[in-house]
């Protein structure tokens, strides 16, 4: 992580409701370029909702949110900012969301051609490099249904990287994978972290969080209960809720 002080993400007093349920409660969060932030917490705590607010997939009701110098407004009233943010922010989901009728390479090259205006030759050249980078260059001509879950998730990662994002969001990227396939996806993410990519990761993989994170955030019932360097949060958590959560998940 570098010491650039201007945050790429700034949340101030952000609130999100689903009906009467207060999902995010006065969230204050700055993320600086090059930082790897891992968000942990129980299911339903608001982790995924938080990162989905960052790229406008979820509207929020009040507060301030600036992403890469573009301000997102409450209730989704930020069409132009949203378009810019979605070209600068990549996201990898639990499900792979690949186009089943397109080859692996075509899945990776489509958005750069349609959105960024790359020529087909340039997009193909870049796409092949990215597939090699995530370790599946030999799968370029196959279709998603012919790949394992781990391979499909690495295609999804290459597709997100093809837009040359300044920030990558990961929403439990290994939760839909068979256990033996989790490692290959985490390895690709480790390489990204080493290269200095700014990353916000929601995960249940605590060993991975300890290894790659610059900062770990524990969310409890829509609030940031505790945050800090991984060695501090995992080894000497201060908040009773953090202690209880870690005692449960680290037993398994």
Regions found by a protein language model. Name each.
Residues 2-3, 242:
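Pre-NBD coupling/linker segments of ABC/ABC-like ATPases
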Residues 220, 227, 231-252:
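C-terminal boundary and immediately downstream tail of ABC-type ATPase nucleotide-binding domains
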Residues 6-230:
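ABC family nucleotide-binding domain
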């Amino acid at each position: 992580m570098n010491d650039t002080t201007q945050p790429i993400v700034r949340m101030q007093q952000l609130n999100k409701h689903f009906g009467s349920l207060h999902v995010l409660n006065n969230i204050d969060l700055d993320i600086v370029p090059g930082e790897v932030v891992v968000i942990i917490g129980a299911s339903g705590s608001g982790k995924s909702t938080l990162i989905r607010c960052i790229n406008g997939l979820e509207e929020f009701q009040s507060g301030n949110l600036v992403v890469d110098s573009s301000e997102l407004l409450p209730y989704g009233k930020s069409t132009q900012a949203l378009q810019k943010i979605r070209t600068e922010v990549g996201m990898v989901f639990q499900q792979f969301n690949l186009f089943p009728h397109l080859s692996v390479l075509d899945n990776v090259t489509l958005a750069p051609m349609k959105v960024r205006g790359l020529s087909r030759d340039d997009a193909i050249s870049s796409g092949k490099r990215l597939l090699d980078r995530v370790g599946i260059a030999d799968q370029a001509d196959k279709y998603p249904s012919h790949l394992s879950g781990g391979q499909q998730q690495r295609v999804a990662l290459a597709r997100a990287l093809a837009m040359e994002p300044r920030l990558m969001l990961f929403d439990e990227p290994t939760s839909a994978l068979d256990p033996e396939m989790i490692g290959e996806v985490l390895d690709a993410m480790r390489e990204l972290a080493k290269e200095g990519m700014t990353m916000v990761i929601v995960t249940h993989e605590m060993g991975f969080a300890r290894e790659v994170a610059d900062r770990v955030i524990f969310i409890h019932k829509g609030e940031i209960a505790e945050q800090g360097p991984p060695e501090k949060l995992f080894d000497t958590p201060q908040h009773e809720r953090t202690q209880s959560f870690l005692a449960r998940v680290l037993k398994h």
